[in-house]
Amino acid sequence: MTQESLLLLDRIDSDDSYASLRNDQEFWEPLARRALEELGLPVPPVLRVPGESTNPVLVGEPDPVIKLFGEHWCGPESLASESEAYAVLADAPVPVPRLLGRGELRPGTGAWPWPYLVMSRMTGTTWRSAMDGTTDRNALLALARELGRVLGRLHRVPLTGNTVLTPHSEVFPELLRERRAATVEDHRGWGYLSPRLLDRLEDWLPDVDTLLAGREPRFVHGDLHGTNIFVDLAATEVTGIVDFTDVYAGDSRYSLVQLHLNAFRGDREILAALLDGAQWKRTEDFARELLAFTFLHDFEVFEETPLDLSGFTDPEELAQFLWGPPDTAPGA
């Protein structure tokens, strides 16, 4: 790759320019090849952008994965979190990528250096592909139980990091406080829920300190959506969990929000199987607490949920509809 190609990075000088180029195959492929060459790693014949993502990601055939971090869209924070997560997970009993190397595309120039990580590629297919591609309900539920076991092991990983993933980190509770202050107006703008329900939400939502009281911090992956989990449905195996830019020392209940509403698409029978595999006791307040975490989550969590929620006016009924046992009547 020539110096001219590196200079193309100067085109990314704002959130808008980053957004328009972040998943551009033609733009990133030569840069990813340069990254592998600089690390002395084999350069595969094929590098492709697997789909839409927050950070530029290219996947090699058959290996590896290259992930680049810009200065926009929380890139510096994402790099710090992901780097810390890989250090913490290095010997953990969970299927995660191996970190093969790291570097910068243009170090020491005074401009943004464009750091990158190179990781091993996960085998299997994404959870989303497996769920969409099977009619074997029992196999899918068995896989959800296995995912629950893996999730339980992830939550028990010791918090040995130095910033975000430490037992006394305040990043997670501060995030929840910020979300509590903003969530009602955000949901008004997103439009998935009725104004009458949102009018009641401020009084219904618990105080963050009350919600977290007595909870031991755990390793929490906050973005377990349908393409961040890799599986082998036929073998009932979870083959990989990826993307550690949204990790916290926090409350394990938070990790269920994207998992259920995005990956499971709100299917409560699949959620019940996962909880069974994780040996997660469903308390009397489970649905109410999980709806609270739904509203405190950092993402637009209903975006991929194929459920019409607009008829609900009572948060308690919405809690049971989304998070109650699978035999609970909808109530809307």
From Swiss-Prot:
GO molecular function, one term: hygromycin-B 7''-O-phosphotransferase activity
InterPro entries per the UniProt record, alphabetical: AGP_Transferase, Aminoglycoside_PTrfase, Hygromycin-B_Kinase, Kinase-like_dom_sf
EC number: 2.7.1.119
Gene3D superfamilies, A to Z: 3.90.1200.10
One matching Pfam family: APH
Keyword Transport recorded: no
Residue numbers annotated as active site: D223
GO biological process, one term: response to antibiotic
Catalytic activity: hygromycin B + ATP = 7''-O-phosphohygromycin B + ADP + H(+)
Keywords, in A-Z order: Antibiotic resistance, ATP-binding, Kinase, Nucleotide-binding, Transferase
Known role: The aminoglycoside phosphotransferases achieve inactivation of their antibiotic substrates by phosphorylation.
Family membership noted in the UniProt record: Belongs to the aminoglycoside phosphotransferase family.
Protein name as annotated: Hygromycin-B 7''-O-kinase
Organism: Streptomyces hygroscopicus
